[in-house]
Amino acid sequence: MSPVWAADEAPEAFIQRITHETLETIKADKSLRNGDMTKIIQLVDAKLMPHVNFRRMTALATGPAWRKATPEQQKRLQDEFKILLVRTYSGALSQVSDQMVVVKPLRAGQENKNLVVSTEVRGKGDPIQLDYRLEKTPGEGAGWMIFDLNVLGVWLIENYRTQFTKEINAGGIDALVASLAARNKTNAKAP
């Protein structure tokens, strides 16, 4: 896909494309279908993560403390948060079998810097509401970037912001980074 096409892609088409490509890749690969976490993490990193604005996501989740953090603290926090999110999303994808994603029409009047695309994941059981908050990026490599997710009515940023604020208030940014690193280390050992 050329960057020009990506820049002109409608937000619903963007979400439909990346979710469809990811689900089809899983359905076509037996080791992915069987929950091979190493391969699923590689898939998430290759197919989804290039479309996520981790800097904005981390800054929003961290709140006012983000602006007070040094560039090194910001980088470490962003790196650890990315690992956590990749593992979380990969864990959800390891459960994929016959699901399909239905992208709902956009609500009118949304702006390109904070636009919500609503989807429904359908398969066995009740459908799961999954919304993506997007921003349009300008310039070279322009296109849509995800900076928040809403799963079953809970926005990811709000959820982590509550957790992060408690950790920052208790021990500062370094304590939050250490906590995320410890959680990531524990999660890496889990099957």
Predicted regions: what is each one?
Residues P127-N159:
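Short beta-strand edge/turn micro-motifs at domain boundaries
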Residues D148-P191:
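Low-complexity, intrinsically disordered terminal/linker segments enriched in charged
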Residues W66, I83-L84, A108, R122-K124, ...:
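Solvent-exposed loop/turn segments at secondary-structure junctions
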Residues D8-Y89:
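Early exported N-terminus immediately downstream of N-terminal targeting peptides
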Residues S2-A7:
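Sec/Tat signal peptide C-region and signal peptidase I cleavage site
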Residues R87-I128, R183-P191:
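Surface-exposed, charged secondary-structure patches
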Residues Q16, L23-T25, Q78, V102, ...:
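Soluble periplasmic/extracytoplasmic beta-strand elements of cell-envelope proteins
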